[in-house]
Amino acid sequence: MVNSGNVVISSGGGGIPVIEKNSSLEGIAAVIDKDKSCALLAASLNADILLILTAVDFVYIDFNTENQRALTKISAGEALRYRNSGHFAKGSMLPKIDACLDFINKNPKGHAVITSLNMAKDALDGSVGTIIYNKNEVI
């Protein structure tokens, strides 16, 4: 499907973690980080774009305050600075930012986009969403 030029959605929540035990599979208690798993898969495929969908159209700093500001295009270094300054909530935007940074670190020619499901198509052409790129990449 990838070789045919299709957009492949291949990582998400809802799976049941299993281990092999005595030649059979056994369910175990574990958390599957869908942001991290999709970033690892995209990097292993050397994907051009990692698209992460969420409830908002952009990543924001100072989220839910009067100073809230949408980030449209930022370097991985800027994203890391905002991350380390505490701008992204654990269990919400933080794992998405971490996944994007991991993807770019493993695939420096690729870039990541975070946006809402409704804006996914437009985000792929760069007209909406937050684009996170390697500072050496030309977008």
Provide a role label for each language-model segment.
Residues 1-139:
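C-terminal catalytic "cap/lid" subdomain
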